[in-house]
Amino acid sequence: MRNTELVQWFRQSTPYVNMHREKTFVIMLDGNAIAHPNFINITNDISLLHSLGIKLVIVFGARCQIDELLAKNQMSSTYHKHIRITDSKTLEVVKQAVGGLHYDIFSRLSLRLPNSPVLNVVSSNAVLAQPLGVIDGVDYGLSGKIRRINIEGIQQQLAQDAIVVIGPIAPSVTGEMFNLPFEEIATQIAIKLKADKLIGFCDQQGILDSEGNVLSDLHPREAKRYLTQFIESGQYHHSAARFLQASIEVCHAGIKRSHLLSYKEDGSLLQELFSRDGIGTQLSEESSENIRLATSFDIPGLLNLIRPLEEQGILVKRSREQLEMEISNYTIIERDGIVIACAALNHYPEEKMAEMACVAVHPDYRDSSRGDVLLEAIKRRAYKLQVEKLFVLTTRTTQWFQERGFVLSTTDDLPKEKREHYNYQRMSKILILELSQ
């Protein structure tokens, strides 16, 4: 990365550093992620998150390691309704696999970068299990489910600046150990902690569409469809499927966002959390973008957006004081709290006209539909004001407005006040759109 790119990325990431501080994230790590060579980088990035003041709970699984040990010992296990039936011999293998991963996670998190503090990593026995019992005539043996979670204990450990690590085996009130699905543990801990995010890893960079493109945003309804596809294709235990199952449930329970990333790509965790568009799939009932009326709190973001365009002569220069006076005229699109597009509606009630002014879209989004979204929002505001004609003055985007129904006009067609202040040095093109009421 060149120095300029590093500086640009660091500046862009700063709002997210502040946004995530003191938040609680639950991270799902299955056995495939832990076994991959990139896991050392994932743990380094987890350590970095902790150093930035993020509270972390790691819930890990061990399915592939259990399968390997069973095969090595010439043992097999059966499944019923996608759940492993665990007898006493199988449980010993499960303990061995889980214990090994537990040690790996602790040792990796203990590897410090130069001049970095020692991490406080703790193993939690906060989960109390109970047997699944007999279902449909099938005895699940030592396969269990959650009976209770000591959330207060986890909260105390997080308050003491610890990273909490929880595995997929847990004791019952009788002292027996049970094998639990790790996604169920992650789901319930995230819900009961009221975590801010659930984060999972798989072998691809999120959920892919039919053409192999990463879906950056996914609604729970769509997530259910992709989960069904995994199940119907016999991939119920695929990392992405298990994450979808967990994320759909936590989303319905009020966890605002879940993120699915690749465990193969170095830095995917940081890119997802500290960049505007991320790199994986975000699952949320709410869009990461919001279109709304601007307030005085948005003025710094508006200035950052329009200043480069003013310096290029594309927009007329506006002072901070002018923005403060006219802020109620502005409609903005924000993404993760960052203003990425704006437009103002200046009303001329006597002529039943209004101007769409100060139209700006962040360079990263100019090839998208944000301009159209702004135009529709401005038109809706104009309709409410009973505006009959919407006009724009532009030096660079004449064709864009013409493609959307605006017609070239002259200064004679402008409202009297606007006509008297028309800047003949800029010689902006005048375009008018008739609004049908």
Curated annotation (Swiss-Prot):
This is Amino-acid acetyltransferase. In bacteria which possess the bifunctional enzyme ornithine acetyltransferase/N-acetylglutamate synthase (ArgJ), ArgA fulfills an anaplerotic role. Belongs to the acetyltransferase family. ArgA subfamily. It comes from Actinobacillus pleuropneumoniae serotype 3 (strain JL03). The keyword Protease does not apply. The lineage of its organism: Bacteria, Pseudomonadati, Pseudomonadota, Gammaproteobacteria, Pasteurellales. Keywords: Acyltransferase, Amino-acid biosynthesis, Arginine biosynthesis, Cytoplasm, Transferase. Transmembrane segments: none annotated. It is an enzyme of class 2 (transferase). Pfam families: AA_kinase (PF00696), Acetyltransf_1 (PF00583). It is found in: Cytoplasm. The gene is argA.
